[in-house]
Amino acid sequence: MFTVFLLVVLATTVVSFPSDRDPASNHENSKGSNRNAWFTPEECCAAPACRGMILEFCLAGEAFAAALDGFRRLPYRLSSE
């Protein structure tokens, strides 16, 4: 009985591991991993549907850009004193 149990465990273990020999499945798996690289965060902020997912990042970027723009408008003087 114990031998039958070991055979069942061995059979289910072998069946549960995916085969790496099928190049078609490897190609499909590699395509799925590149899906997140379609949009950069900056491009995502420009798309309304994507912007909602990373709104905090977009708002922080806009606040930084506005602060940088305001800083660039300040008169710049070198003070020797």
From Swiss-Prot:
Similarity field: Belongs to the conotoxin A superfamily.
Sorted UniProt keywords: Acetylcholine receptor inhibiting toxin, Disulfide bond, Ion channel impairing toxin, Neurotoxin, Postsynaptic neurotoxin, Secreted, Signal, Toxin
Primary localization class, coarse: secreted
This protein's name: Alpha-conotoxin-like Pu1.4
Annotated localization: Secreted
Region (Lacks the Ser-Xaa-Pro motif that is crucial for potent interaction with nAChR): 46-48
Organism: Conus pulicarius
Lipid biosynthesis keyword on record: no
